[in-house]
């Protein structure tokens, strides 16, 4: 790289970093406001931030490689942490079909670059791992509420129930036996997958690094997370690896509430949410209200029309609405399922899913030009007084 090119790269890097600081500040401003109408603006800013970050990584790697050449450093030393490792992984993915072939080819590529991995599932490039982990947290606003583990085992729920108090024993008296019930439920994990075919244009281009990167991190990861959220909230019926909050039959874990009839000046929806909050009060943790957009609007309209608020206009602000009904945060569900308003305590729904940052989560279907990402997963409500589901009459 000649000196003018080097200076141009350095200037571009400084410009991108400065832009990212500004973008993060703008995003933070919208997050404080937390208004639903600002969501498209936030998504556009986050997209630009992501594109800038990818370009920053690329330029930094080019500059680092330029610095290392005169010093005679071994370019293989930090292979697993480099951008080149990501490109090489996608090259392995495109050239090999089947999980075992991909694992063997990636193992050979790591060895070729002086990297020894003791984990039998092998380690993905660090930058891809970080991007996937970030995507898992950011692609669906509900996902953060769940307690997520990567054990890959059968989920077992043990509930010990006794309504009797401890007793005081006096000398000479016989201790009275007290009844208790221990229930054990198990859920067999299921495979949640996303099998994505590639457009003709992409086939002809043989899929560039950036397109593959975006496909895996953005689209495929998000699709899997969205499906897991739907299973946890609504779809899980005990036969598909999940027992959803909506279909949980144990009334000590999830309370089912139906709102009272609507009448002028009354707040049956808000009252039902407060009843749900009272139910989960014994359980420590942040309390979330998960609702569809139309239910959030219905709640806001009801609060504004309440007799008690006749002279006060409730702001169209999640924080203010949440404080009115006693929850810590409102999350707007963006999926397509028939979700009922749900109150859930943080980390009280347990999901176990196979780690998406392991190489055996990926498979390239060469014959049909498809890419497969999958995870073995299951989920259930973990504790008593974990949440409530509200039917709006």
UniProtKB/Swiss-Prot annotation:
Top-level taxon in the UniProt lineage: Viruses
GO cellular component, one term: T=7 icosahedral viral capsid
Coiled-coil blocks: 5-69
Subcellular localization: Virion
InterPro entries: Phage_capsid
Main localisation: virion
Keywords on record: Capsid protein, Coiled coil, T=7 icosahedral capsid protein, Virion
Transferase recorded as keyword: no
Record carries keyword Coiled coil: yes
Processing after translation: Probably cleaved by the viral protease during maturation.
Subunit structure: Homomultimer.
Entry function: Capsid protein self-assembles to form an icosahedral capsid with a T=7 symmetry, about 69 nm in diameter, and consisting of 60 capsid proteins hexamers and 11 pentamers. The capsid encapsulates the genomic DNA.
Family as reported in the entry's similarity comment: Belongs to the Skunalikevirus capsid protein family.
Identification of the protein by name: Capsid protein
């Amino acid at each position: 790289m000649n000196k003018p090119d080097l200076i141009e790269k350095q200037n571009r890097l400084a410009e991108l970093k400065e832009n990212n600081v500004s973008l993060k500040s703008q995003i933070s401003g919208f997050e404080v406001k937390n208004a639903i109408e600002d969501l498209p603006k936030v998504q556009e800013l986050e997209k630009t931030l992501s594109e800038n970050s990818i370009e920053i990584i690329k330029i930094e790697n080019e500059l680092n490689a330029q610095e290392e050449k005169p010093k005679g450093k071994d370019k293989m030393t930090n292979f697993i942490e480099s951008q080149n490792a990501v490109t090489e992984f996608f090259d392995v993915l495109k050239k090999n079909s089947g999980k075992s072939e991909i694992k063997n080819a990636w193992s050979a590529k790591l060895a070729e670059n002086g990297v020894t991995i003791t984990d039998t599932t092998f380690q993905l490039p660090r930058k891809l791992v970080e991007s996937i982990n970030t995507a898992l947290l950011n692609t669906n606003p509900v996902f953060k509420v769940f307690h997520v583990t990567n054990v890959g085992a059968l989920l077992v729920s043990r509930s010990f129930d006794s309504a009797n108090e401890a007793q005081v024993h006096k000398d000479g008296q016989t201790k009275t036996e007290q009844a208790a019930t221990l229930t054990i439920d198990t859920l067999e994990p299921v495979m949640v997958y996303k099998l994505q075919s590639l457009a003709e244009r992409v086939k002809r281009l043989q899929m560039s690094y950036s397109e593959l990167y975006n496909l895996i991190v953005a689209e495929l990861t998000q699709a899997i997370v969205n499906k897991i959220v739907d299973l946890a909230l609504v779809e899980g019926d005990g036969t598909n690896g999940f027992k959803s909050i909506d279909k949980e039959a144990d009334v000590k874990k999830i309370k089912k509430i139906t709102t009272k009839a609507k009448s002028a000046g009354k707040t049956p929806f808000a009252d039902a949410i407060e009843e749900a909050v009272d139910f989960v009060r014994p359980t420590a943790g942040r309390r979330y209200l998960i609702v569809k957009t139309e239910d959030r609007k219905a709640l806001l309209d009801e609060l504004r029309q309440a007799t008690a608020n006749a002279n006060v206009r409730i702001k169209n602000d999640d924080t203010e609405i949440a404080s009115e009904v006693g929850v810590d945060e409102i999350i707007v569900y963006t999926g397509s399922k028939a979700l009922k308003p749900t109150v859930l305590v943080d980390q009280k729904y347990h999901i176990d899913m196979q780690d998406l940052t392991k190489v055996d989560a990926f498979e390239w279907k060469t014959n049909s030009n498809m890419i497969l990402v999958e995870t073995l997963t299951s989920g259930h409500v973990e504790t008593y007084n974990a949440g409530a589901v509200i039917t709006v009459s």
